[in-house]
Amino acid sequence: MLESDRLISSQSIVSEDAMDRAIRPLSLSEYVGQDSVSSQMQIFINAARKRNDPLDHVLIFGPPGLGKTTLANIIAHEMGVNIRQTSGPVIERAGDIAAILTNLQQNDVLFIDEIHRLSPVIEEILYPAMEDYKLDIMIGEGPAARSIKLELPPFTLIGATTRAGLLTSPLRDRFGIVQRLEYYSVDSLTQIVARSAHLLGVPTKPEGAREVALRSRGTPRIANRLLRRVRDYSEVKGNGIITVDMAQQALEMLEVDQHGFDLMDRKLLLAVIEHFNGGPVGIDSIAAAIGEEKGTIEDVLEPFLIQQGFLMRTPRGRIATSKAYQHFGFSAIEQE
């Protein structure tokens, strides 16, 4: 099973991109949540605009689905400049990055998603570009090869990554502004759901928006996806208005519970509790019990369960916590 196959996946899905762009906030005043990041960026942007300078290079990191691309677009909009978007895996050759950099206008934003996946060769080209706005590339091969130095207009590089630890130190050190995005509170997600519903023309009661937010795993991308599915349900089974009852019925049909767990999350936890007495149990045994690959469990299923305190990863194996027992209505004593 792939992460993108799950309804509560925080990964981007191509078919949703157009709709996501339609409901994406364009300014910091519309940007809900991440209050510290928002207030800091407002100051940095205002200062840069006063000086008519490019904004310092920005690194945005955090789990998928929290709005790194959205924030990059907001920064460009607030600066009143164009944004050029690309991603680390797409930039394969020196000529690729050279073509992008030489087409930037003064103070423009270059946004590189998944920046941790840039090759060392591309990073080496970026260093002088970021520091001195100079492009140093080799033309030709062998004895005929020669170095060409080009002046670049001042620009801002915004890098986004879900895995900041994979960035090389030289690249990381060249970002003057580093922002970490955190999971959203239920209150913030409720505002996001209500705003998205309004933009999509979906009548939504405040309690209905909150019910969707509660099951969205702290992630706006999931909240907007669930909102669209609840909208479908309410239009077919109800009068098109998303109430708390309608949201609950829709999400129960979709098998997303009050903690945002789907069928696979519950299957994993129940396997640890019922088949292995709560653990500790090895990952290979869990994989065999639920019929999933070891890598899928480690990369897709476990992280959220561990983060929410339902599962512990120990040297002896995985252990279901008392919180997991309570979730399924079991006595925590059974764990011992």
UniProtKB/Swiss-Prot annotation:
It is found in: Cytoplasm. It comes from the Bacteria. ATP binds at residues 23-24, 65, 68-70, 131-133, 174, 184, 221. Residues 185-255 are annotated as: Small ATPAse domain (RuvB-S). Residues 4-184 are annotated as: Large ATPase domain (RuvB-L). SMART domains: AAA. It is an enzyme of class 3 (hydrolase). Homohexamer. Forms an RuvA(8)-RuvB(12)-Holliday junction (HJ) complex. HJ DNA is sandwiched between 2 RuvA tetramers; dsDNA enters through RuvA and exits via RuvB. An RuvB hexamer assembles on each DNA strand where it exits the tetramer. Each RuvB hexamer is contacted by two RuvA subunits (via domain III) on 2 adjacent RuvB subunits; this complex drives branch migration. In the full resolvosome a probable DNA-RuvA(4)-RuvB(12)-RuvC(2) complex forms which resolves the HJ. Has 3 domains, the large (RuvB-L) and small ATPase (RuvB-S) domains and the C-terminal head (RuvB-H) domain. The head domain binds DNA, while the ATPase domains jointly bind ATP, ADP or are empty depending on the state of the subunit in the translocation cycle. During a single DNA translocation step the structure of each domain remains the same, but their relative positions change. This is Holliday junction branch migration complex subunit RuvB. It comes from Legionella pneumophila (strain Lens).
